[in-house]
Regions:
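Sec/Tat signal peptide C-region and signal peptidase I cleavage site
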Residues: 15-19
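Outer membrane beta-barrel
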Residues: 21-34, 44-160, 262
Length: 327
């Protein structure tokens, strides 16, 4: 299967030579590292890891229609029910006019929060809420309305995060605002109705906020969840905070932590608990260094811990980008 994927990429490169005016950006990206962990019994383990190997491509079909592809090359590309298992993005975005747009294809399931919105290759450890969502990408459609260049509202109908195959009759109905309240306050807010198995459903209100002051930014995500199962309503919430300092675009130092009260994804959208815990607390921090003038090479050192696994983790690693087409 991997040979087929690489062959398709080679075809894309051949096409790009003749039609580079339609491809604005294409690149490989990868992340690898050395992972160390110590549990509460002082048992030590370490190993090298290959975390991500992706291919991304951006371009335009016409002046009003753009597209994006992101393929994970180190993930099983096909499953029995989902031939796009390793494909995060495969969509086109039609700008109908200055206000309206339509996105169709495999895309992000719009759930509010800045942590959730990050590309996985840029996240070293997750909150309980994000870590247990079965999938963050699905096939669907999103109608967007732009109030101005900094504020867009999406109405999205897409496969549910709990729909693990294309044959499931599970959908998610999402209303999401990607916005900017002021020069120092950005938002990713959403309200979601998510279908689960066995006639269960989830309701999210997810409020992601980013506050920027000089070389600092603070991200604060708050998510309220209601699990509507056959017996009663289950209310839970999650909070994630991240404080980052940037030094001359060469170094980022951050701390990040959060708390989940009875994480909804441990309850899942099912009748029985899934790895149920009363609560989930995590914290950590790290440093990223960019030795080149651009951001194509990144070195990192990160520490993190959570009270579910009860392991102290220290990662050293590198992320790099190999550009194929860049305009």
């Amino acid at each position: 299967m991997r040979k087929i994927t690489l062959l398709l990429l080679a075809m894309c490169f051949a096409i790009s030579i003749k039609a580079q005016n339609h491809i604005s950006n294409a690149f490989f990206e990868a992340r690898a590292g050395f992972h160390n962990e110590i549990n509460d019994n002082n048992k030590y383990h370490n190993h090298f890891t290959g975390d991500f190997f992706n291919f991304q491509m951006f371009g335009n079909i016409t002046d009003n229609i753009s597209y994006r592809v992101r393929q994970r090359l180190n993930k099983n590309p096909f499953t029995e029910d989902n031939i796009f298992n390793a494909t995060d993005f495969l969509y086109f975005d039609w700008k109908i006019n200055d206000k309206w747009s339509l996105m169709v294809g495999k895309q992000e399931i719009f759930i509010g929060g800045f942590e959730y919105d990050y590309a996985p290759i840029d996240v070293y450890y997750w909150s309980g809420f994000c870590n247990e969502i079965p999938q963050s990408y699905g096939i669907g459609a999103a109608l967007g309305y732009s109030f101005d260049k900094d504020n867009i509202l999406y109405l999205q109908i897409i496969n549910s995060p709990f729909s693990l195959g294309n044959k499931d009759d599970l959908l998610s109905y999402n209303l999401a605002w990607f916005g900017k309240v002021s020069d120092w306050w950005k938002t990713i807010w959403s309200t979601n109705y998510v279908q689960g198995e066995k006639d269960n459903s989830l309701f999210y209100v997810a409020l992601g906020n980013r506050f920027e002051i000089n070389d600092f930014y603070l991200e604060a995500d708050i998510t309220q969840t209601i699990n509507n199962n056959e017996d009663d309503l289950k209310y839970t919430y999650a909070f994630v905070g991240k404080l980052n300092y940037n030094y001359r675009d060469k170094l980022d130092a951050f701390i990040k932590g959060g708390y989940d009260k009875e994480p909804i994804c441990y309850y899942s959208a099912y009748n029985t608990p899934f790895n149920y815990v009363d609560n989930y607390t995590f914290w950590g921090g790290g440093v990223e260094y960019f030795p080149l003038k651009n951001k194509d090479l990144r070195l990192h050192c990160v520490y993190y811990y959570n009270d579910k696994d009860k392991k102290h983790n220290i990662d050293f690693g590198v992320t790099w980008k190999l550009n194929v087409v860049r305009k």
